Design a protein with these regions (language model features):
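Forkhead-associated
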Residues: 77-157, 263-337
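Intrinsically disordered, low-complexity acidic Ser/Thr-rich regulatory segments
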Residues: 1-100, 117-122, 150-286, 340, ...
């Protein structure tokens, strides 16, 4: 089965031209239907798609809050030994392409699915992370709390820019009974925590011991790519803490060369690359073939990944085909866009 399977519904047609980018103040979207109602009404649409999958993975289901109809589903299947990623947004290069709300960013968030050890029935469920791509509004959890990312193993529910997203586990067709009410009732309870590294109070004070009589899905709120300030086009800059440097990113475009020293915390949260002002070193990148938000450099499961965020001209190891996820396990030259090269060096 394909690593990423896509079903788009309700008028989400590609090649229709990408809507003009809209800059506006952050607002909290109005949810017209309750989350349970949205799930029950749309279950007959997405459940048959999910039942067909017997490999571990996740389904990302988007429901338009305005119409209360499912807009699409992306099935992301886990692989042994390598991460898989998918991107949601209003750009037609996105896997989960959504055009029903102009408030959604062209590239809203990426989902990174961790490798699995086995595909055998009963094996440990796939873990995943959702990372907001430094958008204006970010996301909300089902309790209405603003966030920039989550890490989870099990179902989660997110809301942003007029959509509700159900992220559900794949691999066991019996998780999707015929009755929508039964499916909702057996869905594990979502229990939210803050990661100790980014929460002043830590998560210990909020910790609830697991209950044997309940199925629970533990979700950790995380940070996303941070605002790192302006880096001028002449030389170099620092992303993160100078005293905790992880490595150096060298970017060479048609006329400019940029050096970014990146800290361990910044790598964990993610370093966003592209021509947009919300990306690191955007003022220094002079290649028009780069997308506004082109790639994400992030450390996941002790592996450094470059994730192409649905760019138009792609990301690739020089001499190879474009790829969505590239693991930097050695010194290697990458090409982003048509005329820009990039190399990572570990410093510590």
């Amino acid at each position: 089965m394909k690593t990423i399977g896509i079903d788009l519904w309700d008028g989400q047609l590609r090649q229709g031209g990408n809507a003009q980018t809209i800059m506006r103040p952050a607002v909290v979207p109005t949810i017209r239907r309750g989350i349970r109602d949205l799930f029950l009404e749309n279950y007959p649409r997405f459940a048959p798609v999910c039942r067909t999958v017997e490999e571990p993975g996740i389904a990302i289901i988007a429901i338009d809050d305005k119409t209360a109809r499912a807009a699409g589903v992306v099935k992301v299947l886990a692989r042994v030994g390598r991460s898989v990623a998918a991107v949601a947004g209003r750009h037609d290069q996105c896997d989960l392409y959504l055009r029903g709300n102009d408030g959604l960013a062209l590239r809203q968030f990426t989902v990174v699915l961790s490798p699995v050890q086995s595909w055998a029935p009963g094996a440990k469920a796939a873990q995943y992370r959702v990372i907001d791509l430094r958008t204006n509004d970010g996301m909300m959890d089902e309790d209405g709390r603003m966030l920039r990312g989550i890490r989870a193993e099990g179902p989660s529910i997110l809301r942003c820019s007029g959509y509700t997203f159900f992220i559900l586990a794949l691999g066991d067709p019996t998780d999707y009974p015929q009755s929508a009410t039964d499916a909702w009732d057996v869905m594990p309870e979502r229990v939210y925590f803050d990661e100790l590294e980014v929460c002043a109070g830590g998560s210990a004070a909020k910790l609830r011991l697991p209950r044997n009589d309940l199925r629970q899905s533990y979700i950790f709120r995380t940070q996303g790519p941070r605002e790192t300030g302006v880096i001028n086009h002449t030389a170099c800059g620092v992303v993160g803490n100078e005293r905790d440097l992880a490595g150096r990113l060298e970017i060479e475009g048609p006329n400019r060369r940029v050096i970014l020293d990146v800290g361990h915390d910044a790598l964990r949260d993610g370093v966003l690359l592209g021509r947009y002002g919300r990306c690191d070193a955007s003022e220094a990148l002079d290649d028009p073939s780069l997308s506004r938000v082109h790639a994400l450099l992030v450390c996941e499961n002790d592996k450094l990944l470059v994730i192409d965020t649905a760019s138009y001209n792609g990301t690739r190891i020089i001499g190879e085909h474009r790829a969505r996820v590239i693991e930097l396990d050695r010194d290697v030259d990458l090409q982003i866009g048509k005329h820009t090269r990039m190399r990572w060096h570990w410093l510590g």
